[in-house]
Amino acid sequence: MKYYSTNKQAPIASLQEAVVKGLAADKGLFMPMSIKSLPQEFYDTIDTLSFQEIAYRVADAFFGEDIPAETLKQIVYDTLSFDVPLVKVSENIYSLELFHGPTLAFKDVGGRFMARLLGYFIKKEGQKNVNVLVATSGDTGSAVANGFLGVEGIHVYVLYPKGKVSEIQEKQFTTLGQNITALEVDGTFDDCQALVKSAFMDKELNEHLSLTSANSINVARFLPQAFYYFYAYAQLKRAGKADNAVVCVPSGNFGNITAGLFGKKMGLPVKRFIAANNRNDIFYQYLQTGKYSPRPSIATIANAMDVGDPSNFARVLDLYGGSHAAISAEISGTTYTDEQIRETVKETWKDHHYLLDPHGACGYRALMDGLQSGETGVFLETAHPAKFLETVEGIIGEAVEIPAKLQEFMKGEKKSLPMSKDFADFKKYLLAL
């Protein structure tokens, strides 16, 4: 499969080039030349298949031409060493729990898959010393760092905004050591992302170092996220609830919903999507006005969605041929304040004894507000509520149980290097490696 850039000014790339480069030479995002529809018999029998079997079929459609079947199967099965259960919260609304992986967030799927795929390519080429740069507002850093931990020939640099990441999130990537280095940037998530993008565009840096990205701009990070949309449908089908499925995705950088939209293009029977925003409602405003107006991000209690210029919007636009009408026909938007998010967490805990994290709360509320009669709603519960301990405990007025996996991270010692948001300083640091 070949990949083209959303900006249409860069040469066509192979899967390996797209994964290793991360970003195209014209600063665009890579897109596969074609999206294969999966046969009807797959959908007819999907409820009889395991998560790994479903994921392998989806992965084969994207990556089968480039990776030997046995290798791909091993990558998929290794990646998905945990379940993603669909849990009923209230009448016709289900939570797709994406927090059962090693770092208790949805990004474990993309992070683990990408680490294994990149590891395969590096081994194949006999390469050494590949540097992965990743900007994080919280969960990406931990998922990518833990996915790549101990992978030979790769060193990961996690850039995160000082004081803007919860202690639990921070501990998940600052305590690992080995081939993981945490850089504490004096700025916002957007500043961290700008440093990473500038590094890729810098000719001198790229002559000295082999650089790649693990943000959702990388095709190996966001495409595997399609796996769990198919698995959600399989679980709905088992429950006899697969007709008129509506999927709501709490949205920040838009990699997650883009993967779902790819699933729909492959024939996945989802009636429509809802993108739930916090106060960073850039996409919501686009749906209303047809104009995309990025602006600086605002800090909210759903911090992983505090993105003022979502990278993957370019992919959504490309997928629908730039048509606002086509996009708004399949995706609607909602936007919620911190107050509304708090209210939702509190009421859902009180009424259904189901504990939401602030991001999942946006998803659940959007379905409560927007589900029509005869529809079944699925929202993506993207991280375990204990990852936002102070916020969630403050809302419900009770102690939240911390899962054993998280407790292990909390015991580690934080090690990070301070970094300014000035690219010249970051470049100097990288050149000295």
Feature locations, PLM:
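PLP-dependent amino-acid enzyme catalytic core
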Residues: 1-433
